[in-house]
Amino acid sequence: MNNLVPAQAGAQFITLFIFITLARWYVAPWLAKRERADALIALLWVHVFRYVALQIFVAQRDGFPISTHGAMEIIIGDVGGAIIAFAAIVLLRQGAFAGVVLCWLLVAETATDTFLNIRSGIEEHLMGAASGVTWMILVFFVPAIIVSVGLLAWQLVARRSEPRNEHQRRELPVAAGRLLEQR
């Protein structure tokens, strides 16, 4: 009996459950105490390191049975996501609304990338084939990406009416500023 598939799937599920629990108990309350841009930036940093997907070439060389097309799909999606995340951080730090737009783009890109990677993994029978660093990325980093993109989407929706930055908050009428502070 091959225990590799249930081991990987089980480990991914457990990690996902733990990250969701951490997000509920600790991350969500912490985000609520931050300005919108700061909350988004904190969540974006997880995505900046998606270039770790370049490791797929080493895994492929060492016997991970992914096709070159499948590897390139992963690289394009994850390196692209890392670039979008970093650009969004830069723009949010400058107070530019384009940073929020890039956050939405990252949510859509990550959802698409995740779907395509799952589809490719099924088509190429990759579940349970990972080992070493590839296994660690799939079991720990991928669930972190999934949870952080969920939190990112939640922050974008829940805080869509907040001013973009502290400067805009100071320009609000006094009563409007008090309403925002009570949130």
Residue ranges with predicted function:
Residues 51-62, 111-128:
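C-terminal ends of transmembrane alpha-helices
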Residues 116-123, 135-163:
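C-terminal transmembrane-bundle signature of multipass membrane proteins
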Residues 77, 81-85, 102-122, 142-145:
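Hydrophobic alpha-helical membrane segments
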Residues 161-183:
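Short, highly charged, low-complexity non-transmembrane loops/tails of multi-pass membrane proteins
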